[in-house]
Amino acid sequence: MQLFHLCLIISCSCPTVQASKLCLGWLWDMDIDPYKEFGASVELLSFLPSDFFPSVRDLLDTATALYRDALESPEHCTPHHTALRHVCLCWGDLMNLATWVGTNLEDQASRDLVVSYVNTNMGLKFRQLLWFHISCLTFGRDLVLEYLVSFGVWIRTPPAYRPSNAPILSTLPETTVVRQRGRTIRRRTPSPRRRRSQSPRRRRSQSRESQC
């Protein structure tokens, strides 16, 4: 809790712990979801288990290898690139803060508590953000959103009524649980009513009505 107040004091420029509590109340009153503008939500990401996401280091290496030029460019590329820039910078600042706090704490138990809190709580949020934006840039936002919905449906379906393997993002069109409209065979097969041919008299009357 002392570390949390310290973070709030630094970020809010508040000189006292009481002021940090005021900052905390202000933050709790705001309904900020970093995925809303991209069509997703924190709840949708929460269906994926924590061990699904790679480590922050692996995700940062992937972002650097694939999109370093775009991330370092002064030009605006996409909202996902902008979000990735902010996530990378925030993670760097968080690591600097954690290092500073860990260095200035004399108690080893407190230092271990700081490292554990950052890795367990804040680390997961950063892993989710990095994975989401990298995946959207790699596979496309629509496919990633479809995957999240498909995985959510799969994980909430009882094991006896769902496929044994979870959906895989790279092969989603073949294994997805929730399919888009127009992809099923039934929609491609015309109904018996459509196959019936209309008589010339009926077609003639319909053409006259359309002219009117």
Swiss-Prot record:
Signal peptide (UniProt feature, chain positions): 1-19
Q: Where is this region: HBEAG?
A: 25-27
Q: Is Disulfide bond among this UniProt entry's keywords?
A: yes
Bias-annotated ranges (Basic residues): 180-205
Sorted alphabetically, which keywords does the UniProt record give? Disulfide bond, Host nucleus, Host-virus interaction, Repeat, Secreted, Signal, Viral immunoevasion
Q: Which residues cross the membrane?
A: none
- Region annotation (Disordered) maps to 179-212
sequence repeat segments run 184-190, 191-198, 199-206
Q: Which residues form the propeptide?
A: 184-212
Protein role: May regulate immune response to the intracellular capsid in acting as a T-cell tolerogen, by having an immunoregulatory effect which prevents destruction of infected cells by cytotoxic T-cells. This immune regulation may predispose to chronicity during perinatal infections and prevent severe liver injury during adult infections.
Name of the protein in question = External core antigen
- As recorded in Swiss-Prot or TrEMBL, the protein's gene is named C
